[in-house]
Amino acid sequence: LHASNAAVIDGGTITVKSSVEALEGTNVTINGGTLDLYATDDGINAASTATGAEIFIKITGGDIKVEVGQGDTDALDSNGDIIMTGGNLAITSTVSAFDFDGKASYTGGTITVNGQTRTEITADGPGGGGAPGGQGGGPGGH
């Protein structure tokens, strides 16, 4: 699913069984719904070449499963920020759960990566970014 600017999911059921990038836009907001995404590259991708573009992935609700293939892949890849305030995010990835160039904020919801609970969002893949002080967003702003 590709949006040239904002991709906003407010509800419903979305299943992507095979894709290169399952859900992408300049910014991606998931407020609710059930998403089951599989990608051979990035599961959810926020990127833009436009100067000054507001680039982010924001999850406020929903039940989201993201599985990515092997290689240089990221479950969530943002050229800006990753923000999570609610919802349930279950990631299956052999390489990288999160890759971001901005900051990470995790104040609510649940995150599991390969069945293990995460208490913060950290860039963990090859070339994993995160601006200085941007890594380690955890519940309660930690």
Task: Annotate each PLM feature.
Residues 1-142:
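A composition-driven surface/loop motif
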